[in-house]
Design a protein with these regions (language model features):
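A short beta-strand motif characteristic of beta-propeller blades
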Residues: 2-10, 50-59, 95-104, 153-159
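Repeated scaffold domains used in trafficking and secretory/extracellular systems
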Residues: 12-19, 61-68, 105-117, 162-170
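Blade-loop segments of beta-propeller domains
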Residues: 14, 48-74
């Protein structure tokens, strides 16, 4: 019965994304901080070993929402605003501060991510009338875009999804699973 505890929960962290690699016994969680200090990546494992990585951008504390994190190969992909930040896993494992750079601009607000061995999916939470797509089920108001891990600048496909999505995955059978929620009280 192995489990891990996110070390930031009692220190003002607001967890956003989670990525798990069972083969390497790695759990990564992104969080922004209530006190507006640097956003973080928490690295934990099944032995409850913990490491905190603070994010910087242009030498200053990066305080973005860091809504999603995914792992594929030797890289972690973090979504924030309209950008994806690609970070070497080895840096997360060894450094206390990581400069995230300018990131790669994507075609949506990059609220969440999912990665497999070939693709990175980047989607947005949107609840406004931004990307309205009408179908027999109703109106969808958000998108999720698929990128090749070899080229994060050119969309491979764009999916119309319901609004208020906070998590996304593609199963081994090719099914798309969406997770929705919003406005949990403090």
């Amino acid at each position: 019965d192995n489990y891990c505890i996110n070390p930031g929960l009692n220190h003002g962290a607001v967890p956003q994304g989670i990525a798990v690699d069972e083969d390497r016994d790695i759990v990564l969680t992104t969080a922004y901080m209530k006190d507006k200090s640097a956003s973080r990546i928490y690295l934990t494992n099944s032995k409850n070993e913990q490491k905190i990585v603070s994010l910087t951008k242009n030498g200053k504390a990066f305080t973005g929402h860091v809504g999603g994190i995914s792992l594929s190969g030797d890289y972690a992909y973090i979504s924030d605003g309209d950008r994806i930040y690609k970070i070497e896993l080895s840096k997360i494992q060894t450094e206390d501060f990581i400069e995230i750079g300018e990131g790669i601009k994507v075609n949506n607000q990059a609220s969440f991510t999912f990665a497999d061995d070939e693709y990175l999916y980047v989607g947005e939470f949107n609840y406004a009338d931004k990307y309205i797509c009408e179908n027999i089920i109703g109106d969808y108001k958000a998108i999720c875009t698929k990128y090749s891990l070899d080229d994060l600048t050119t969309p491979v496909a764009t999916y119309s999804i319901r609004d208020k999505v906070q998590g996304f995955c593609v199963t081994d059978k090719g099914d798309i699973v969406l997770s929705t929620s919003w406005a949990v009280a403090d």
